[in-house]
Regions:
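N-terminal glycine-rich anion-binding loops that anchor highly charged ligand groups
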Residues: 51-61
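C-terminal substrate-binding/active-site "lid" region of AdoMet-derived donor-dependent transferases
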Residues: 3, 188-254
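Alpha-helical subdomain
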Residues: 181, 185-188, 208-214, 267, ...
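A generic structural signal for alpha->beta connector loops
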Residues: 119-121, 144-146, 201, 227-229, ...
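SAM/dcSAM-binding transferase cores
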Residues: 2-53, 67-73, 241-292
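Short, surface-exposed beta-strand-loop junctions and turns on beta-sheet-rich folds
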Residues: 64-67, 164
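The AdoMet/dcAdoMet-binding core of the Class I SAM-like
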Residues: 3-17, 75-196, 238
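Short, small-residue-rich loop/turn micro-motifs
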Residues: 62-64, 177
């Protein structure tokens, strides 16, 4: 996705912090004052970087919303709480062979899985070529035998998988643009295709940011497709809700296994999922499933 005629153009002075700069991927020679004007008035239509001494973030506007965030001293770290919660799929499938990600962003989850899940093949599907073009600036590794980035519509990609009978162990959905979450991944057809692509043992995880009533409608639709239990983990600070669904959540015989998987993830990766396990146990009780 590299283009020798494009480079990162740095613009300062937009924020009050002198250590904070904005970086735009534009053709060499693009006037800085034009970039300053366009981003300030909200007419700039591409993702850009906001960088200080500690973090590099991807944004679509100067509205306080961050699309992706990276620590400069540890590019593969999961800095956002919701990304750590999404890794809760490891509770249900500790060693997935394949993980499909809908939405690349700055590649936080892709980088983390590539570094730590050494037997897992990760495919990240991203519709925006401009987002993919920034991958090297977020230290997303080049494609190899365990990582592949695809420039395609994620809902269409999953529909093709379902139509061809292809399967994956995990689907992670974190598909946002300047207008919010991609509408296509909230449609029932997408959920049904995702369920088919996951088969009998796959786990579905989606990050939702929306008003409470809207979230509840989406959660009920997910429940109507995947069945109960559907587990919702709400972030206290940023309003994200991470939702888990799929057959592995339903089997009470696997409850002890989920605990062991959670302990393994905590010891090996420093990822802890007490809220997920507590919610799972509560849902099992309410549904009449006996968890040891």
């Amino acid at each position: 996705m590299s283009n020798p005629t494009h480079k990162l153009i740095t613009v300062g002075g937009i924020t009050t912090d002198r250590n904070t700069v904005l970086k735009f991927r534009e053709p060499t020679g693009t006037p800085r004052d034009a970039l300053f004007r366009d981003v300030a008035n909200g007419s700039y239509r591409k993702p850009f970087l906001v960088e200080d001494l500690e973090y590099r973030t991807m944004c679509f506007a100067l509205d306080g919303c961050t699309q992706s965030e990276m620590r400069l001293d540890d590019p593969a770290a999961l800095t956002c709480e919701y990304t750590r919660k999404m890794m809760g799929f490891l509770v249900f499938t500790a060693r997935p062979k394949q993980v499909l990600m809908i939405g690349l962003g700055g590649g936080s989850l892709a980088k983390y899985c590539h570094r730590h899940l050494l037997t897992t093949r990760v495919t990240a599907v991203e519709i925006d070529a401009e987002v993919i073009a920034l991958r090297t600036h977020f230290h997303v590794p080049p494609d190899d035998a365990r990582l592949r980035v695809v420039n395609e519509d994620g809902a269409h990609y999953v529909a093709q998988m379902a139509g061809k009978g292809q399967r994956t162990d995990v689907i992670l959905v974190d598909a946002y643009d300047r207008f919010g979450i991609a509408k296509a991944v909230l449609e029932r057809a997408f959920m049904e295709n995702a369920k088919q692509a996951l088969g009998a043992h796959g786990v579905f995880v989606i990050n939702l940011v929306a008003e409470v009533d809207e979230c509840e409608r989406h959660i009920e639709m997910i429940r109507s497709v995947f069945g109960d239990p559907v587990i919702v983990i709400a972030m206290k600070r940023d309003g994200n809700r991470v939702i888990f669904a799929g057959n592995p959540l339903r089997n009470p015989r696997h409850f002890m296994l989920t605990r062991r998987n959670a302990e393994r993830a905590g010891g090996k990766l420093g990822l802890f999922f007490p809220t997920l396990l507590r919610h799972l146990g509560t849902r099992h009780e309410r549904l009449g499933l006996r968890s040891p």
